[in-house]
């Protein structure tokens, strides 16, 4: 599509932009719920981490909309550093766990599903050849769901809530 051209409300590009907007908006709610937390990962509060992610999602939304904006590799590294620091602070995961240990943990679990949907919608738009995005954008979106998962676990861990595995019975 050409710059300034109207796009269909049902296009893959519009769906991708909508999914990114939903994720960003939901992360705003998570950020409000996280304001009172005092713990830090890589020197950043939970609120700081989410704020950085929201800023980066605006860059990705601009890129998906056709603007000359890209996510830089250092932003992916920031996500990976947070994921690694959270994982090192907790016991290793042995199985899937039930969402909802704490309110914040549950919110991060929902954010994780929004992040995965946004990633799928962006990939769908790329595969439909409606948009073109950089590899770093795809990598960032992929790692973002991992960050949300790590922060869900870390939130529960810091609150002293034990993870509960599904029973499969």
Stretches found by the model and what they are:
Residues 1-169:
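Phosphate/pyrophosphate-binding loop motifs in nucleotide- or prenyl diphosphate-using proteins
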């Amino acid at each position: 599509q050409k710059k300034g051209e109207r796009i269909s409300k049902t296009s893959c590009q519009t769906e991708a932009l909508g999914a990114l907007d939903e994720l960003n908006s939901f992360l705003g709610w998570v950020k409000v719920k996280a304001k009172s937390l005092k713990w830090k990962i890589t020197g950043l509060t939970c609120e700081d981490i989410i704020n950085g992610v929201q800023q980066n999602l605006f860059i990705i939304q601009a890129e998906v909309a056709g603007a000359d904006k890209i996510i830089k590799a250092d932003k992916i590294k920031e996500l990976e550093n947070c994921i690694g620091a959270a994982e090192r602070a907790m016991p290793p995961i042995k199985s899937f766990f039930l969402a909802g240990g704490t309110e914040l943990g549950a919110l991060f679990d929902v954010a994780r599903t929004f992040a995965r949907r946004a990633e799928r919608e962006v990939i769908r738009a790329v595969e439909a050849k409606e948009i073109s995005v950089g590899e770093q954008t795809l990598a960032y979106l992929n790692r973002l769901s991992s960050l949300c998962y790590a922060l869900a676990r870390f939130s529960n861990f810091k609150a002293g809530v034990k993870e509960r595995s599904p029973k499969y019975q």
